[in-house]
Curated annotation (Swiss-Prot):
This is Ion-translocating oxidoreductase complex subunit E. GO terms for biological process: electron transport chain. It is a multi-pass membrane protein. Pfam families: Rnf-Nqr (PF02508). The gene is rsxE. One of its GO terms (cellular component) is plasma membrane. It comes from Escherichia coli O6:H1 (strain CFT073 / ATCC 700928 / UPEC). Its EC number is 7.-.-.-.
Length: 231
């Protein structure tokens, strides 16, 4: 159970692919102009990570070490092609919005990295969980960045959600404030870099605060009974 918990915590927070490893920045910065686009690409990446980790882990004993990377890429490309066709069939509006960034998941360092670092060494169940956790960590980072950029740039949230979730999702669109013209800095790549930088700073501050609390808790437990640690 502790290993399962560690895999989940590492994927979602401690080893977050976007905020710690800084992998997959090209789609992260390019696609997150809206929360819907960010969520769509994040979920697609999560599905690819989960399926490729599961497949590669299952076949790891029959994969020659000398040609393992080409085999990994072939497996990843097959899964990405299937996911791309699913999005094209059932969410065509999202397919048009994401464009080239769906097939580019094949070359995403996150996917290949987890295949080599984790799936090739662990069992199928744990590898699938690792892929799902890493994918959801990246999805959360993309969604937060996309939401911030959409709110600041357009004053809306979940604009175009029907392209991802169907016609019923039109009710999810929220207008935070009205604007006649978008704030282009937030919508263009410079806004993505600024937003990502703020998120990195926020994660650092949270980690430092949590580390300080743990240190104080350990120090209090180490004190003899009746002492408070104050001079």
């Amino acid at each position: 159970m502790s290993e399962i918990k560690d895999v989940i915590v590492q994927g979602l927070w401690k080893n977050n692919s976007a905020l710690v490893q800084l992998l997959g920045l090209c789609p992260l910065l390019a696609v997150t102009s809206t929360a819907t686009n960010a969520l769509g690409l994040g979920l697609a990446t999560t599905l690819v990570l989960t399926l490729t980790n599961l497949t590669i882990s299952t076949l790891r004993h029959w994969t020659p070490a000398e040609i393992r990377i080409p085999i990994y890429v072939m497996i990843i490309a097959s899964v990405v092609s299937a996911v791309q066709m699913l999005i094209n069939a059932y969410a065509f509006g999202l397919y048009q919005s994401l464009g080239i960034f769906i097939p580019l998941i094949v070359t995403n360092c996150i996917v290949v990295g987890r295949a080599e670092a984790f799936a090739a060494k662990k069992g199928p169940a744990l590898s699938a969980l690792d892929g799902f956790s890493i994918g959801m960590g990246a999805t959360c980072a993309m969604f937060v960045l996309g939401s911030l950029r959409e709110i600041i740039g357009n004053g809306t949230l979940f604009d175009g959600a029907d392209a991802l979730l169907g016609s019923w999702a039109k009710v999810l669109r929220v207008e935070i404030f009205h604007t006649d013209s978008p704030f282009l800095l937030a919508m263009l790549p410079p806004g993505a870099f600024i937003g990502l930088g703020l998120m990195l700073a926020g994660k650092y501050l949270i980690d430092e605060k949590m580390k300080k609390r743990r240190t104080e808790a350990v120090a209090e437990r180490a004190l003899p009974n009746g002492e408070t640690g104050n001079v």
